[in-house]
């Protein structure tokens, strides 16, 4: 299982790189779970990241505005991101989510056929009125995405496992694999929960808080020693 770590600036990105993260995922925590950072931060992070190491960019907890979201996705793509992560926050149904992701996929793949598109739903979708997390694999498949992902929308200390049990998460992983895609799971994941994600076949685990001082995604800073500990658990 590979590790995605989400820095908010280049200094944190260096810590994640030195700690051994596999994917450097640029985000902006004050703007939400999948808060979008600025194009120049993505560009600077890409320049700071070793060649061959992939850079991801979250483009926001997005509304149901396909044109707006598509432009954001293209902005992240041309800024140097290899993975484009879309948080399907304002989409209320399969059809709305599909509408957003089909257009994002078209824009991203037209700009770079090797770019990777991630459709991200929320395990706690019921708290914010977002699309059912269990339809995300179908949305991703039908939109031509590469990865189906789950995160949590509300960052209040509850983790992925507070909203979906292991059986439901296993169902999500297995359906995603059945459709020939990779599966990514995140959501205030604690280091001791990572072995359970490995057990159900998760391909990519995403963290920020667990790699930050005081375990605080907002006030804390990513530290390479914390990243190293998480990498070790992912590799064991």
UniProtKB/Swiss-Prot annotation:
Keyword presence, Transcription regulation: no
EC number from the UniProt entry: 4.2.3.153
GO molecular function, one term: carbon-carbon lyase activity
Catalysed reactions listed for this entry: 2 D-glyceraldehyde 3-phosphate = 4-(hydroxymethyl)-2-furancarboxaldehyde phosphate + phosphate + 2 H2O
GO biological process: methanofuran biosynthetic process
Highest taxon in the source lineage: Archaea
SUPFAM superfamilies named among the record's database cross-references: Aldolase (SSF51569), FMN-linked oxidoreductases (SSF51395)
One Pfam short name: 4HFCP_synth
Top EC category: lyase
Pathway this chain belongs to: Cofactor biosynthesis; methanofuran biosynthesis
UniProt name for this protein: (5-formylfuran-3-yl)methyl phosphate synthase
Gene that this sequence comes from: mfnB
């Amino acid at each position: 299982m590979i590790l995605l770590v989400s820095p908010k600036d280049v200094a944190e990105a260096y810590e994640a790189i030195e700690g051994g993260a596999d994917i450097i995922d640029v985000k902006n925590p004050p703007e939400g779970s999948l808060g979008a950072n600025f194009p120049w931060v993505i560009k600077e992070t890409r320049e700071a990241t070793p060649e061959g190491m992939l850079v991801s960019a979250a483009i926001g907890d997005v509304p149901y505005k396909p044109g707006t979201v598509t432009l954001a996705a293209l902005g992240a793509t041309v800024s140097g991101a290899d993975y484009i992560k879309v948080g399907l926050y304002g989409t209320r149904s399969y059809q709305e989510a599909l509408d957003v992701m089909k257009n994002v996929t078209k824009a991203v793949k037209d700009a770079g056929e090797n770019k990777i598109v991630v459709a991200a739903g929320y395990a706690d979708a019921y708290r914010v009125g977002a699309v059912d997390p269990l339809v995300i694999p179908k949305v991703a498949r039908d939109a031509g995405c590469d990865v189906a992902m789950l995160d949590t929308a509300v960052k209040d200390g509850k983790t992925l496992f507070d909203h979906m049990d292991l059986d439901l998460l296993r169902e999500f992983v297995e359906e995603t694999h059945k459709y020939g895609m990779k599966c990514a799971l995140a959501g205030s994941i604690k280091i001791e929960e990572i072995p359970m994600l490995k057990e159900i076949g998760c391909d990519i685990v995403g963290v920020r808080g667990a790699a930050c001082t005081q375990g605080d995604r907002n006030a804390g800073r990513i530290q390479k020693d914390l990243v190293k500990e998480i990498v070790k658990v992912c590799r064991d």
